[in-house]
Structure formats: C-alpha cells, structure tokens
Amino acid sequence: MSQAEIDFITQFRTIPTTCISDALDGLTNLTSTIKPLNENDQVVGPARTVQVASGDNLAVLKAMYEASPGDVIVIDAKGDCTRAIAGDFVLGMAKTLGIAGFVVDGAIRDIRASKALNFPIFCRGTTIAASKKTGIGNINVPISCGGVPIRPGDLIVGDADGVTVIPKGQEENVLQKAKKKQADDEARERAISDNVMAIRAYLEKMIHPS
C-alpha cells in the first residue's frame, strides 16, 4: 500500500464498527459468533482471502507468503471448529511479516500464547487439534466468511463489537457516512448526559413521533 492509502484506511481506526455497520445498513457484518480473541483487538486493512478445506491450513501459509504488510488474512474455513486453522506459531510469523490481523471463520489454538502476541485475531472458536497440510485450498478468490461475501481487497474493520466489510470502491462513501453517524451519536449522548428532562424528551420523541 502507498502511504496515502495507509493514511486513508487509518481513519477507520477512530470509528466504531457500529457506526460503519450503520453506514452500510448492517448488510456486511460477519456473524456475531466471530469475535476478537482479546477484547481490545482492532484490525483495519485490505482482505487477503483464503479458502480452505476442512482441517487443512497450507493455503493459509501460502497466503502469508504472498501477503503485503497491512493485509488482513481472511479465512473461509466454513465455520469448522474441529481443527485449528492457526496457533501461536503461525500467528507469530504473521505478526512478524507485518500482516495486520487474522479473521477466521473457524478455530485457532494455543490460546494463552496467541493472546500474548498482541496481534489482532478474530475467530469463531478455539480447539486443541491441529490442521493438516495437504495443500487443498485457494487464495485471493471470492469467499464467504461469517455469512458475508468477501472479495480480495475489500476493507476489513474489526473491534470489540465484531467485524464488518466495506466493499472495494465504497470506502470513501462509507467513511463519510460513518463519520457523520459517529458525530451525531456523540452529540446525542452529550445532549442527554446527566439530564433527566432531556432523556424524557428523547424517549417521548421516540415513542410518540410527530
């Protein structure tokens, strides 16, 4: 990515995923079962997509080898949590390579060590069993992750509330809408802060719109 591209996508770090979701009418949010391993995990970056067969992660290693710094590895493991797509060894290599984070529609393992990496990891679950490496899988292809279609280069944004996807080409429009939603939310919160009358007026307006 160019410095201009990095500066642009960095703006999404200051906006909650809830506001980005609202800007996209909630249509591109991954299933709520895909959660951050650490509550403070946050990830923003273009998707480097991976499609794997159940219990096989060689394609993940290929994607890491080809990834550019700042990419988010997004893995369609079809929700299978019987075998881990990655553990602390693979995740540690990804961090060293400058990969921005992992989003896995499946499981990881080595939880304590993985948490200690301070590397953004979003996954459906955890398990003990390792994956095989038979080579079955595809990289940089359209996938479905967490019930949402994702194409290579789509912008991935994740925080404590979950993960959402901004389709490539819509980033600027979504950024402006999300910024406005964030500003409106903050103004509304300031207006009612410790103000019983303002709260009652707001509730009245919502319950009995004119």
From Swiss-Prot:
Job of this protein: Catalyzes the aldol cleavage of 4-hydroxy-4-methyl-2-oxoglutarate (HMG) into 2 molecules of pyruvate. Also contains a secondary oxaloacetate (OAA) decarboxylase activity due to the common pyruvate enolate transition state formed following C-C bond cleavage in the retro-aldol and decarboxylation reactions.
Binding-site positions, a divalent metal cation: 110
Cofactor descriptive note: Divalent metal cation.
Domain of life assignment: Bacteria
Cofactor dependence: a divalent metal cation
Keyword match Lyase: yes
Example GO molecular function: 4-hydroxy-4-methyl-2-oxoglutarate aldolase activity
Lineage, uppermost ranks: Bacteria, Bacillati, Bacillota, Bacilli, Bacillales
Reaction(s) the record says it catalyses: 4-hydroxy-4-methyl-2-oxoglutarate = 2 pyruvate; oxaloacetate + H(+) = pyruvate + CO2
Family in the record: Belongs to the class II aldolase/RraA-like family.
Protein name (record): Putative 4-hydroxy-4-methyl-2-oxoglutarate aldolase
Enzyme Commission code(s) on record: 4.1.3.17, 4.1.1.112
Coiled-coil region list: none
